[in-house]
Amino acid sequence: MTTLRMSTLPKTWVLDVDGTIVVHNGHLRPVGDELLPGVKEFFASLPPQDVVVLLTARKKEIGPRLEAFLADHHIRFDTILYELPAGERILVNDCKPSGLPTAFAVNKKRDEPLSIHVVRDETL
């Protein structure tokens, strides 16, 4: 399990789709997409004011099927970016003047459960 100690400020969550929240390339299987363990619980734990951005290399034209699947499983998102390159995802952000880090990265093994524990620290 990954534990992140963060402030209580609203957050932007950026998550890849395949291999992170659903089985990698599951949409190509006859049974279709399948949520990975821990995904429902993780999304249920996100405060309503947080923003969720999903990233995928999938083609935009199959987006409605993914979006319907996510809605059926109560996985909320604000934006999905489609047709992204399959290479590394790089996040760059500045620190707050107080020194508070404003960017985190979690690398998880493909198709493993999503296991992130967030500690909201009011002193940060």
Each PLM stretch: what is its role?
Residues 1-124:
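HAD-like aspartate-dependent phosphatase fold
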